[in-house]
């Protein structure tokens, strides 16, 4: 009986561990594409068997790319590991994953364009989908990390990454690597902050070896944000940065406004008409060689505040606050950077001021 009990406990322990692994945040099975096709499933760089790459199903013209491979005069570099995949015209990759129905999830993946065309990616988990433009390159390596969110409609999610492009040269398709997932837990307002997720602690998965931050593109038409409670209301992306690779004013995460007035973030808060509120926040730099004069513009309804910040590119921050009287039951809080900035160490990577620790509280009467 004792041996039977031990056997049962062992089986239960294994089942528990398996369950935890199944739903843990991190890289998808073979999300880095390091497990590749057999030589018999290849024709040059093209993968000719739709199930040749473990854990993935392919459709259309998909290439298996080795780091250092040449495309004309261009050397193709992989951000991590040795391999990535390239999606030709109308090509796609997909993977089915066990999830929890009703939960919110964020996908993170690396992408790089290989030609001058206006390349885009269509990311979908039915019924949600979104088109992500990758024409703008934010880092000097050519690779950027992107995030996209969805809500699980069932216990199985079919994740599809599709290239909707129609380039004349199929070799002009985008490169994909490092596909990861993270469960999102929508935050709630508290008696210490009317805004939700004001410290940006809840957000997309950041790959441990990623030193560029994660781009959250504009999702005006999408139902879910990978940065819960916040909307990217601009033409360009904002960047989600972590304390492991950047200077962060508070906690472990923050947001970098990397594209001037084209990079804005907003949240709508419930307010009482005629009541006075104080919007407070931190402005700084990410310790990423982003130097020079910066200005963050903060908006609360019809009121605005410009906060200058002189950056040496070595980290640091200052605090600011905006006092206003609510004129509506719903007040839009928004931030953007007045100027465009480039990193001084490579002059090709977009950067900008960091905002963090955003709080909205009702003010006491004097």
UniProtKB/Swiss-Prot annotation:
Keywords assigned: Cell wall, Developmental protein, Glycoprotein, Secreted, Signal
Glycan-carrying positions: 98, 122, 209
Cross-referenced Pfam families: DUF642
GO cellular component terms, semicolon-separated: extracellular region; plasma membrane
InterPro entries: DGR2-like_dom, Galactose-bd-like_sf, Pectin_Meth_Modulator
Record localization: Secreted, Cell wall
Purpose of the protein: Together with BIIDXI, acts as a positive regulator of PME3 activity during several developmental processes, including seed germination and endosperm (testa) rupture at the micropyle, probably by modulating the pectin status in cell walls.
Subunit and partners: Interacts with PME3.
Name of the protein this chain belongs to: BIIDXI-like protein At5g11420
Organism for this UniProt entry: Arabidopsis thaliana (Mouse-ear cress)
